[in-house]
């Protein structure tokens, strides 16, 4: 759970923090990059409406967790390989990342046998997970500055999402 939440937050922080710069590097205008960035934030809210409708019907949530994690992986890679489709990749990433966050927090409650255990699991998963996530944007920014483009940071996010799956 800790790794699942941490990787999701790391990838989300990298994309939310660097998406406008990524889009500008691919020829988008500042207005276009800002609009796509806004779509990302809206797309992360949609799973809050959709995921609960599906979750209560599933006995095993691993399949949906893997699917939404792979949405993050494919969309991060897509931003590099097919930047002309950035709106689609952003919407897919937003949905996947939002759903992953909901699932990660839900897993804590599902795995705990008591309120005390849920609080302990939540504290550990979120504190370690967010500590990991906080390293993402500066690290990927440094990699970008060293490499000169966003290929390695985006592919690193895609690979991290595969690990999360």
Regions found by a protein language model. Name each.
Residues 80-90:
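Helix-loop junctions at membrane interfaces in 12-TM secondary transporters
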Residues 63-77:
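Structural signature of the two symmetry-related core transmembrane helices
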Residues 9, 13, 94-102:
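Small-residue-rich segments within alpha-helical transmembrane domains of MFS-like 12-TM solute carriers
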Residues 155-165:
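Multi-pass alpha-helical transporter architecture, strongest
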Residues 99-113:
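Intracellular juxtamembrane helix-capping segments at the cytosolic ends
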Residues 112-151, 157:
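A late C-terminal transmembrane helix in Major Facilitator Superfamily
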Residues 1-48:
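Extracytoplasmic gate region of multi-pass secondary transporters
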Residues 47-60:
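Helix-to-loop junctions at the C-terminal end of transmembrane segments
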């Amino acid at each position: 759970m800790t790794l699942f939440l941490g990787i999701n937050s790391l990838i989300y922080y990298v994309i939310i923090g660097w998406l406008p710069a990524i889009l500008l590097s691919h020829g988008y205008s500042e207005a276009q990059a800002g609009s796509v960035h806004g779509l990302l934030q809206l797309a992360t809210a949609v799973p809050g409406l959709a995921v609960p409708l599906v979750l209560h019907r599933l006995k095993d949530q691993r399949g949906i967790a893997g699917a939404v994690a792979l949405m993050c992986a494919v969309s991060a890679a897509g931003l590099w390989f097919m930047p002309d489709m950035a709106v689609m990749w952003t919407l897919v990433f937003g949905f996947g990342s939002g759903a992953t966050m909901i699932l990660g927090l839900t897993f804590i409650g599902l795995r705990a046998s008591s309120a005390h255990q849920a609080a302990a699991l939540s504290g550990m998963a979120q504190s370690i997970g967010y500590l990991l996530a906080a390293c993402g944007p500066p690290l990927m920014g440094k990699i970008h500055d060293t490499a000169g483009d966003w290929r390695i940071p985006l592919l690193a996010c895609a690979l991290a999402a595969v690990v999360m799956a």
